[in-house]
């Protein structure tokens, strides 16, 4: 994935938003909560209406008139730069989906101030950078936010409140933190864990991490699947610090193998599969996430992790690295 300086700026934003939302609670007091916030709902609103990897016929029919066609056309023009999936994404997805979605801003002026702040940071780090495209995207975001807050968000919020209550009732009973810490040997150090529900984009990427303790999800999925994925994603977040460097290393490694096979999915698939594997172990049964990754070879990876575990390998990072190498060996590749 080609990176831009705005991707680095987006990383800086996620660090700041993590700090803002992290209450630094001790292990025994950690809460996992479902929340409704306008920012992530606005981002998915734009992504859905413009068709940037998200679609929702019911939502689009209801709200397509809330954004000018010319503005949607601007976003569509840069679809490849804004879309994301399977651990990859366009160079501006980090800024305009993940960073903006994880921020807090009360109106269009606050949104503009946030974007201007990080645009200045980008220009200081790389003087003379062409900002034409991000400026055009930012203008669409700023110009349409106040109208969204007035005409769309109140009903969208109301639509999600019943599911929010159901999720929080069950999340209070769940023991995800203790279960995952016991299974992995890792400790959670990022305070309360936030699930941000979004109304638009029924067909599109869900479970998108916005910072170290904040995730996002389409609100109205199968309840059993949603709870299984809440556990799955907490595992991803818990293991992220140890596996992220290996993930990047393996992305580079698989690209250099000199094969015509598409291996871009392997590092992502191995990580999702590892979380599925632990989730099954924690639950003592096959959980609903196990067969939900259509583009990941989860069953093969889980068999590999079974074998490595039987050899006495328990550390998630070691399971991940060795699991990828064994998977590549099955494909006739790697060392």
Task: Give the residues covered by each predicted segment.
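Bacterial Sec-dependent N-terminal signal peptides
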Residues: 1-24
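Auxiliary, metal-adjacent structural segments of Zn-dependent hydrolase domains
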Residues: 152-209
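N-terminal mature-domain "stem" immediately C-terminal to a signal peptide or N-terminal signal-anchor/transmembrane
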Residues: 22-108
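Active-site recognition of the HExxH zinc-binding catalytic motif
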Residues: 227-245
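Long, mid-chain structured domain cores
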Residues: 77-177
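Pan-zinc metallopeptidase signature
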Residues: 287-335
